[in-house]
Amino acid sequence: MHNRAVKQYLEYLKISGIQDIFIKPPIQIDKTELLKGLEEKYKNCTNCILHEKRTNFCYGNGNADAKLMIIGEGPGADEDKLGKVFVGRSGQLLTKMLSAIKLSREDVYIANIVKCRPPENRNPLPEEKSACLPYLDEQISVIQPELILMLGKVAAVTLL
């Protein structure tokens, strides 16, 4: 609203008999705690067949206030074992790539399209991706990154 419109609105309220206006301060949200709560809420997901053989639900990890969010395809064997994203060979490569551009894993948030490991590291099926996309949408909404880097064809095709 422009100043003139605000002034007119306040005049209207005064004429209407309203004498006091109370404005609540914006609510501060701890994004890290919110993401932990969402992970806790979804970690026992059974929305697709991937849950049947998973060891761990790999929600995502990193800086909840990151300007850069990195999204991959899905967890591999190492990730499934540890419950963290990008910790295997591809994670080591990602760490080196980030270092080359003067970033660390603590500067970014990393997630995947699917949160459970597809068998034999196959590409996630459409219904598996559909089951996990609401979780990823929530992560993106909480983090509100300035930039999203999609790693690989599955991530790019799914999100574009």
What is the predicted role of each segment?
Residues Q8-L160:
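A polyanion-binding, active-site-adjacent surface
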